[in-house]
From Swiss-Prot:
Cited SUPFAM superfamilies: P-loop containing nucleoside triphosphate hydrolases, RecA protein, C-terminal domain
Entry annotated with the keyword Nucleotide-binding: yes
InterPro entries to which the protein is assigned, alphabetical: AAA+_ATPase, DNA_recomb/repair_RecA, DNA_recomb/repair_RecA_CS, P-loop_NTPase, RecA-like_C, RecA-like_N, RecA_ATP-bd, RecA_C_sf
Family annotation (PROSITE patterns): RECA_1 (PS00321), RECA_2 (PS50162), RECA_3 (PS50163)
Listed GO biological process terms: DNA recombination; DNA repair; SOS response
Record's keyword annotation contains Translocase: no
HAMAP family: RecA
Main location: cytoplasm
Ligand binding (ATP): 43-50
Name of this protein: Protein RecA
Alphabetical keyword list: ATP-binding, Cytoplasm, DNA damage, DNA recombination, DNA repair, DNA-binding, Nucleotide-binding, SOS response
Amino acid sequence: SIMKMDGSQQEENLDVISTGSLGVDLALGVGGLPRGRVVEIFGPESSGKTTLCLEAIAQCQKNGGICAFIDAEHAFDPIYARKLGVKVEELYLSQPDTGEQALEICDTLVRSGGVDMVVVDSVAALVPKAEIEGEMGDSHVGLQARLMSQALRKLTGHIKRTNTLVVFINQIRMKIGVMFGSPETTTGGNALKFYASVRLDIRRTGQIKKGDDVIGNETKVKVIKNKVAPPFRQAEFDILYGEGVSWEGELIDLGVKYDIVEKSGAWYSYNGAK
C-alpha cells in the first residue's frame, strides 16, 4: 500500500508498554517499550532478564492488555510471576518442543491481533528441529541463525500491522580470539540485532544485603540500540528476591537525582519530612 504522510493514515504518537521500572522507562526516552516493534533484552545468567519481562507483562495486564509468554527454556515459574504482579490465569503460556514451533506460535499470536505483547524466553533455547532429531555431537552450523533470520523477515510486517510488542530474551556467548573490543556476542546470528528497534543490556552490578543475608541484586540497564529515541542512556535499580523491581528505592533515587528529595548522610528528606 502507498500512503501520504498527511496524518490521516499514520498515528504519530507511539504506543508504549511500561517496563515496571521508572528508570528504564526514562532511559528508553518514550516512557516504555514501543508497541509494533521488536525488542531484545540480553545479559548474563541471573541478571534479571526474565524478571524485567514479567514486570512489563504485569504493567501491560494492569492496563487491560493480553500477553503471551513463549517459554522455550521450560523454566517459567508461575509462583514468582504472581509475586511480580502477573495475572497468571490470564497469561497465554506456551512451552514449545522446537524452535520452529515456538516461532510459528509467535507468528500466529501476532497475526491474530488478539495479543498486545509476546515474550520469547529465550532465543538461545530455540533449537532447530533438525538438531533435536539429530544425534548428540552432530554439527548444525548456522541453523539457528537461519531460523531466526527467516522468522524475523516474516514477523516484522505482522508486528507493525497489529501493533504488537514482541520481546526476545537472549543470552550472551563469548567469541573466540577477539583481541580488541568486547568478546561478548548474543546467540542466534545477527538478524535480531538489525530487526530490533530497542536492545537492552542488563547486568547485575552488586548484591543488596540485610545483615548477612543477600536479599536482592543491584542492576544496571544500558540501552544499546534505540530507534525511537536517543540510545546509550542507562538506568540503575534494585531487584529484590521474591518482589521484583524495588519501586520505592527507584523513586527515592530519582528524587535525589532531580533534587526533589534531599539526601544528607543516610537520611532522605522531602519538604522537611524525613
